[in-house]
Regions:
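Loop/turn-rich, solvent-exposed surfaces of beta-rich toroidal or solenoidal domains
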Residues: 264-318
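Beta-propeller fold detector
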Residues: 38-49, 89-104, 139-148, 193-205, ...
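Entry beta-strands of beta-propeller and related beta-repeat scaffolds
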Residues: 65-70, 119-123, 164-173, 222-228, ...
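Short, small-residue-biased leader/transition segments that mark boundaries at the very start
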Residues: 2-6, 11-12
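Structural motif
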Residues: 74-88, 125-137, 168-171, 175-192, ...
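Blade-level signature of beta-propeller repeat domains, shared across WD40, Kelch, NHL, RCC1
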Residues: 328-378
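Beta-strand-rich domains and repeat architectures in extracellular enzymes and scaffolds
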Residues: 46-76
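Repeated scaffold domains used in trafficking and secretory/extracellular systems
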Residues: 50-62, 103-118, 143-166, 203-220, ...
Length: 378
């Protein structure tokens, strides 16, 4: 016989044996999350001020080991905050304090070119590749420059650390220039050496040329895919959309576009992430009726995009407030990205936190995460 009762806020279930003497008692407690699981939460205020102060210079935020590093163009000052040990469900709290560290970046370093591979950072300075194990001390990496060529772009890297990598592709994808022409190149890291493969097809003029933003993710089949966006060259015909370029090996890149009215609009300094099983792009718009940051754009396939008007919002757009008379107010922080045309940089850390750093006009650091990525599922 089974009977039910309530004990406080818990449901009590009693299971009695046929002799009516032996019984087991079970108590069930249902816990309700007060947060909307699929909502991106940034908090009401930025988590910290931009430690570089009021700057119009380009910046780059990256993760390296247990640290998040913030670089500023034309500066040897690097700011660092530590990611504490633990898992995303441990209610970790960090990012309020940033420590100043002095670096020795090479002359002409382009901080927007920084990528991470195999627990090292790589950047370009005057078309030469440099690497660093800590982001502070940098050394030229002549091996990564093919003979008779210069490196014009570091695109991204493929690594076992990115997820299931059945093809065992580990290395750095770049663009090199030879005899006045640009080609895709891939430096594959083996146990003891680099093997560099340079393609024969010229890089399309539509491929992004600067301020690249890339992400690498594992597919359901266990292979890695890389995606990249960025600023394109001036004067291109029909350049009215932000097109994602994708690659399975770093050697060949294809544009993910189809004739459609549902393209991602043309954005300045676009950033792309694969997050919570979807793709997101943000950047600055340049429409007559919409300047600066407006919203995230999302796609499940990289081909058809739509603007996000709820749940996954830009930092500083606060929850709507219902006033008397049925009027709904849509408040936002003075440090919101909405409508701003500032320089910015963005990264996702291992705890699924999205970090967005704004330059002059915002000068703040925001940290956000989709709520359910911090839930403990039992």
């Amino acid at each position: 016989e089974i009977s039910e009762c309530l004990v406080g806020s818990e449901m009590c279930i009693r299971d009695r044996a046929p002799d009516m003497q032996t019984q087991n008692e079970y108590r069930v407690s249902v816990r309700m999350h007060r947060m909307v699981p699929d909502s991106l939460s940034w908090g009401k205020e930025p988590i910290a001020a931009n430690p570089a102060g009021i700057t119009e210079q380009k910046q780059k935020i990256v993760t390296l080991g247990d640290n998040i590093l913030l670089f500023t163009q034309n500066s040897d000052k690097v700011y660092s905050t530590t990611i504490p040990a633990g898992s995303p469900t441990d209610r970790l709290n960090y990012g309020q304090n940033w420590e100043l560290k002095n670096a020795t970046l090479p002359e002409g370093a382009d901080v927007t070119s920084i990528i991470r591979f195999d627990e090292k950072l790589y950047l370009l300075a005057n078309n030469k590749v440099y690497n660093s194990a800590d982001g502070l001390m940098w050394a030229e990496d002549a091996v990564l420059t093919p003979s008779g060529a210069t490196v014009s772009n570091l695109i991204t890297s493929f690594s076992d650390n990115d997820g299931s990598n059945h093809k065992k592709i580990n290395g750095i994808a770049s663009i090199v220039e030879k005899n006045g022409q640009k080609y895709f190149s891939f430096a594959e890291k083996t146990e003891n050496e680099w093997n560099i493969t340079t393609g024969e097809e010229i890089v399309p003029t539509e491929f992004p040329v600067n301020n690249l933003s890339a992400d690498v993710y594992a597919t359901e089949s266990g292979t890695l895919n890389a995606i990249v966006v960025g600023n394109t060259a001036d004067g291109l015909d029909n350049d009215t959309a932000t097109v994602v370029w994708a690659s399975e090996d770093g050697k060949a890149w294809i544009p993910m576009e189809i004739p459609s009215n549902n393209n991602c609009p043309k954005l300045v300094d676009p950033s792309i992430i694969h997050y919570n099983d979807a793709f997101y792009i943000c950047g600055k718009e340049n429409k007559d009726d919409a300047k600066g940051f407006q919203k995230f754009y999302t796609s499940p396939t990289l081909l058809v995009w739509k603007g996000v008007d709820r749940m996954f919002m830009l930092p500083g757009i606060l929850p709507p407030v219902k006033l008397e008379g049925g009027v709904t107010q849509y408040p936002y922080s003075e440090y919101s990205f909405k409508g701003k045309e500032v320089n910015y940089t963005m990264v996702v850390d291992r705890n699924h936190y999205i970090w967005m750093v704004g330059g002059k006009g915002i000068d703040k650091i925001w940290r956000g995460r989709v709520n359910k990525l911090g839930f403990l599922i039992q």
